[in-house]
Amino acid sequence: ASIIISSYDTSTGNSLSNKVSNSGKFETDDTGRLVSKAVDKCMEEFIATMNMKFADIQKNGRSVLVDFSFSENSSYNMTSQVGNDKLALSDVLEEWFSTNSFNNNYHIQGTTNLKMIFDDVKIPVKDKNQNNYTTNKFALEIFKYLKTLGLEPSKEIKGSTIYLTIN
């Protein structure tokens, strides 16, 4: 019997560990026994990989992607001046991510007039009160910040991706 074992981070949907194994050839009609042998062959390595990923997430944070765009009727774009300093929205967003990503760890995939994608933003596993910190909580923080800039955002979350549309 051949098996594939996979584990995923429930908060983001990101893969933690994947292993493929087979039982080898045995003379038996007992499928359960064959599956058990296949699992036994890979379980130690599977758990070690998963534990290594958990330790990395604890140390370096969880990865999320944040995609900013504009609704068709929006009067804003990434060069619109916002905030007290009247900086371009793209610059204001980068400053916010610099301060609010875990250990200042983020990467910008690209910025155009109508889109900005942070393709790897690290967020903590726990908040300052040691409560679970989820993708949804991070999205809410961004949403509230955009509101303080006088913007009217909408948000959607799919797995580890946050979509923010500025209306």
Could you say what each language-model-derived stretch is?
Residues A1-E27, T165-N167:
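Amphipathic beta-strand/beta-sheet edge segments enriched in Tyr/Trp
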